[in-house]
Amino acid sequence: MRKLTPGTNIADFDAVRLSIANEDDIQKWSHGEILKPETINYRTQKPERDGLFCEKIFGPVKDINPHDVKFKGMRSREMAVDKNGEVVTKSIVRRERMGHIKLAAPVAHIWFLRGTPSAVGLLLGMTVKNLERVVYFASYIVLAVETAKRDKILADVEAETDAAKQAIEIRYEAAGKEESADIKALAEARTKELEELVANYQEKKDQLQSLERCRILSENDYRNLPEDYQDLITVGMGGQAIKQLLDDINLDALIKELTEEAEGAKGQRKKKLMKRLKMLEGMQRAGIRPNSMCVTVLPVIPPDLRPMVQLTGGRFATSDLNDLYRRVINRNNRLKKLMDLNAPEVIRRNEQRMLQEAVDALIDNNSARGGRAISATGQRRRLKSLSDMLKGKQGRFRQNLLGKRVDYSGRSVIVSGPELKINQCGLPKMMALELFKPFVIGELIAREQAHNIRSASRLIEMGETVVWDALDEVIKGKYVLLNRAPSLHRLSIQAFQPVLIEGRAIQLHPLVCKGFNADFDGDQMAVHLPLSDKAQAEARDIMAANRNLLK
């Protein structure tokens, strides 16, 4: 998030690139660490200090006058001073300032763990199933192997096997020289003993060679390993283990290694390698660190974006995000306490797993593994997570950013108009009058049928005949844009010449329906009016339906 100097033109940019925020980025955004799960003190009705609505971190609830008599106490001054030591007096900062939660143990980010394809899986060359077993403390993962020790043990095992073979050969050779010896029985016994020895050697060799980085070991498998084998490897569990593996990745070296491997690969193997390479090269270009896919510092969004509102009768209605943040803080504080007390490993592991599940539910409650977080109010409904606020028709992008209300626009149901030309659309008279109202007012004044804007507006309200004549005049040669959501490609928005019609539905030529993916079973379309001469020229020359016949 780049700091802008006053007077910077925020519209002056060439492109937007999304990247993964690392620990340092989040701490730069933040104005303080949230330590308590409390929100508002129910006696004083003021935000709790270091809580989810803390005024010191997020700014004052009400605008402050620094010269006011009330603004004297140390507490009041503290809550109004930001981290640069400047006094904050406007409550609007509570829509901008972020906080953070320092996690007691790293957790894997669910978007990168369970996405399709799994980013962490592609980085480490592992399946999502195996990653989940590690992240949720069901299995160990090998973090490092002492190869020199392993090779020495393998050489010792081989030497022992060779010595045992020689001993068997000598023993059976001596037994075969005795007069009463049953040569056939001895040969069978010798062969059986040698086969057992070779099988035992092969088993030990396979077991040693299988101890490599990123190998998954269940609890029983690890416990059943001989002690000297356990000393060869470093194992881990949970988000901490995944973070350590990601820390060790050198993108340049890994890209070079995979490129060489892909040159000699074929078929499905090559396809998998190319998929990994594509993601790794993208991360390298964007300067993304692999360990950013694990969360150690969790950002907390501004309180005015997750409000708490008092209802009549003293009760409070709160955003679901506050409940989800509260779960994370409670579990994080409990884990810190257990670590300070040096609690048994099994208890700490369980608390780390619960912390992982709480962060999963906060980020994406649909994909959370440990059961979806539900409301504690008795309604048993699923809590809305950060992902739910962003995705879908009601999400931040489609509802608030792409779906903003626009002046000089309208919306109506579409019906077939086969008598129209392909570059024409039927526009209801009342809708056209509202869209072209300023132009109609200008035309009425130009014709001297009205002396000012007020008298022209009065004529329009009364529906005088001169108004419709003026409307006919102003729409000549004009183009309007028709858009059908979702706008998936360029043909979702096309320009048409309006033809005034009775009724309330927009008429559309059947032959242009394909581009809009529209049909006449109740679909709705939006109309937009390009205002400037340049916009009209662009609509006429580039966006007109008769100029978009070939895709």
Language model: regions and residue ranges:
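Conserved core architecture of multi-subunit DNA-directed RNA polymerases
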Residues: 1-551
